[in-house]
Amino acid sequence: LKNNKKTLASIVVAYSFGGMAFFAFLSWIPEHLRRTFDWDISNAGLVFGSLLATIGSIGAVSGGKFHDLIYKKGYKDAPLRCAMIVFLILFPVMAITPIIPNSNITVVMLGVFSFVLFFQQAMSPIAIQMITPNHLRAQVVAIYFFVATFFSIGIGPSIVAIFTDFLFQDESKLNLSISLTSLICLPVSILSLYLGLKPYKRSYLKVRN
């Protein structure tokens, strides 16, 4: 584990900050649809949930195939490289979607978000398993999920509430809070993944050799 600390740190930091942005977005978008477009909250949840269940499922399968394609091309850092590409796409999508003034375009963007979000869903477990010895995989994955989940679910949604109540001090600015959370968290994730590419490749080669 000491030999892979840079690699593991890049994965944990990337997915902790990315998770904060993702769960903030997932938690508050239905309420955003209610406040901005006067949707019934149950309809907002139904529409968003349906997009996640259908288009998101397609994205999850597509993401696995994309990873395998990149890996077969010789990129040993494929899990991090694929995740970085996905985060780069999600960054503008998540920053722009909450401030779109048209509900129909917003729904289309939520469809794009659902597909791309689930596209990277399996990347972090794959990344950890590929560089961890067999007898340590369960422990390392468990620690990763504990830390990432704590930040993602425990802190992510609260950031939006804090921005709305204390920064903007206006409930109608919820959309700006969601957007700002993505603007802050996702660049950290992308940078962490980028810095982790070379250490990850070294870690992968050590395990294989």
Indicate residue ranges for each PLM-predicted region.
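Helix-to-loop junctions at the C-terminal end of transmembrane segments
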Residues: 59-75, 164
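Extracytoplasmic gate region of multi-pass secondary transporters
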Residues: 4-63, 117-121, 125, 152-160
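Primarily residues marking transmembrane-helix entry/exit sites
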Residues: 4-12, 103-107, 138
